[in-house]
Amino acid sequence: MKQAIHPEYKKVTATCSCGATFEFGSTAREDFYVDVCSQCHPFYTGKQKQATTGGRVERFNKRFGAAIKRN
């Protein structure tokens, strides 16, 4: 195997806007910041707000449902 052709593998720290830090190995870059992580993302915390806007079928029935029922 050739020597000294592989990139340097170093520890990198990702810091979230909520203050959580994660350390892992990488060859790509140095420390960086992220907007959301598993500790503050609404999907993972269970505080997810769901906007029930209805699907395509409900939208169709809202527009044409009365016309179909008359026939």
UniProtKB/Swiss-Prot annotation:
One of its GO terms (biological process) is translation. GO terms for molecular function: metal ion binding; rRNA binding; structural constituent of ribosome. Keywords: Metal-binding, Ribonucleoprotein, Ribosomal protein, RNA-binding, rRNA-binding, Zinc. Its cofactor is Zn(2+). Zn(2+) binds at residues 16, 18, 37, 40. Binds 1 zinc ion per subunit. Transmembrane segments: none annotated. Pfam families: Ribosomal_L31. One of its GO terms (cellular component) is ribonucleoprotein complex. Part of the 50S ribosomal subunit. PANTHER family: 50S RIBOSOMAL PROTEIN L31, CHLOROPLASTIC (PTHR33280), LARGE RIBOSOMAL SUBUNIT PROTEIN BL31A (PTHR33280:SF6). Belongs to the bacterial ribosomal protein bL31 family. Type A subfamily. NCBIfam families: L31 (TIGR00105), PRK00019.1 (NF000612). Binds the 23S rRNA. This is Large ribosomal subunit protein bL31. It comes from Chromohalobacter salexigens (strain ATCC BAA-138 / DSM 3043 / CIP 106854 / NCIMB 13768 / 1H11). The lineage of its organism: Bacteria, Pseudomonadati, Pseudomonadota, Gammaproteobacteria, Oceanospirillales.
